[in-house]
Amino acid sequence: MRALITGASSGLGRDLAIKLSKKGYDLVLISRDKKALEKVKKDCKTEAILYEADVSSTEACIKIHEKFKDIDLLINNAGFGLFGETCNTSLDKELNMIDVNVKAVHILTKLYLKDMIEKDSGRILNVASIAAFPPGPLMNTYYSTKSYVFKFTTAIYEELRRRGSSVKISVLCPGPFNTNFNNVAGVKFSLKGKSCDYVSSYAIKGLFKNKLVIIPGFITKVGYFLTKIAPLKLLLKIDYNMQRKKDK
């Protein structure tokens, strides 16, 4: 068995790699940071192939698929956020975020999905966020990208179900947890986040139970439920105030 993980050099990607290695998966670890991948490899008990790539590039994503064909589990984990009013945030950073958070997920999912359907076997885990559900003033582009990942993944689930395929797909929607995401996005969370170890363990359990939507933590589940019943304008006010507290 072999798993391919993007954004594998730190945080959730790193923890997922180590845990899957303990379950017997050989690994293909993708990141822009080869040195950090080397450190992850030392903690893995199975074969780990390291591949330096920037998944914001369409060509890089296609090359990954061409180079690593025999994949049983794809985890699209690479992603980042950006804090600020839409009128003030960097357009270049936002476009890069869309490339990483959306385009790369779309390309790699689509390419590997075709392979998995052909052999009627395989799993895909796309990492979204609880941010997929509420509106996201002050982190607008990030929330929008995660909403795309959620809808994209759940739609594929139904397509697979209708065709009677054995291929499984899941979407992980964690709340705040402790990774380098905060530093990159330029935020600090007002609520104490879950540990990365907890989120990765919960993700793997949900993945192998064939859960479609994986939401770690009771508080995060409550938050998800509230987004389904609260009026939109109330959600906008609540979310804006929560986002403002994140400002470093």
What are the language-model segments listed below?
Residues S9-S10:
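Conserved glycine-rich cofactor-binding loop
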Residues K23-K39:
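Conserved glycine-rich Rossmann-like NAD(P)H-binding loop of the short-chain dehydrogenase/reductase
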Residues N77-L82:
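Conserved NAD(P)H cofactor-binding loop of Rossmann-fold oxidoreductase domains
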Residues E85-T86, K93-I98:
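Substrate-binding pocket helix/loop in short-chain dehydrogenase/reductase
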Residues T109, T145:
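Active-site helix of classical SDR
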Residues S129:
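Residue(s) in the substrate-gating loop at a strand-loop-helix junction
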Residues V171, K188-Y224:
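C-terminal helical subdomain
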